Amino acid sequence: MFSRVFVRAASNAAKAGVKPPVKLFGVEGTYASALFTAASKETSVESASSSLVKLSSLIKEDAKLKHIMENPALSTKDRAVVVDSLVKSSANLDKPVVNLLKVLAENNKLGLFDKISSQFSILNDAHNGLIRGSVTTAQPLDSKNFKRLEKALQQSSLVGQQKTLKLDNVVKPDIKGGLIVEVGDQTIDLSVSSKIQKLNKVLEETI
């Protein structure tokens, strides 16, 4: 029942020209995108985001609740009880978010809530003109180099006009050196490990 209601709301919003600002992938991305379109039509993106943050905080603070939500063996009845408990514990939740919880309970996907919430935050950032990006390096970048790179990316076509870049430094020693830049759904791989892989491929093809 709630699956149909949730999907119908998202579908109506899509027909009205409401589309997520960035394309997400995977099951979590699909749910997050559907919530974005439904919230845009019925309430607001800000309201949905606020409710998700509230619920995420509640779940994070209750280890037992988190464990229960991630239990795939939970019965349909018990999943419904969990949702009712969440709704009662969090006053004035956004309606599309409540419908999302019920859909997740129906489909035994409550364990995906945290990931869906995380994916929705990406949509919310983009909706507010904030583009997320990351630069992966073998060792942490010092503040000076990080700011120089952030400024260069902010002014590049990867970010675009009237957008603000939110850049994080991800450390992965296995890339050996160089860096990997990811902005939105675009990736620039300048890592040493990537160059080694390309060299190995060339060598294999010539042998």
Swiss-Prot record:
Main localization, broad class: mitochondrion
Any GO molecular function: proton-transporting ATP synthase activity, rotational mechanism
Gene Ontology CC, one term: mitochondrial inner membrane
Functional summary from the UniProt entry: Mitochondrial membrane ATP synthase (F(1)F(0) ATP synthase or Complex V) produces ATP from ADP in the presence of a proton gradient across the membrane which is generated by electron transport complexes of the respiratory chain. F-type ATPases consist of two structural domains, F(1) - containing the extramembraneous catalytic core and F(0) - containing the membrane proton channel, linked together by a central stalk and a peripheral stalk. During catalysis, ATP synthesis in the catalytic domain of F(1) is coupled via a rotary mechanism of the central stalk subunits to proton translocation.
HAMAP family: ATP_synth_delta_bact (MF_01416)
PANTHER family, per database record: ATP SYNTHASE DELTA CHAIN
Quaternary data: F-type ATPases have 2 components, CF(1) - the catalytic core - and CF(0) - the membrane proton channel. CF(1) has five subunits: alpha(3), beta(3), gamma(1), delta(1), epsilon(1). CF(0) has three main subunits: a, b and c.
Family: Belongs to the ATPase delta chain family.
Name of this protein: ATP synthase subunit 5, mitochondrial
Species, as recorded: Candida glabrata (strain ATCC 2001 / BCRC 20586 / JCM 3761 / NBRC 0622 / NRRL Y-65 / CBS 138)
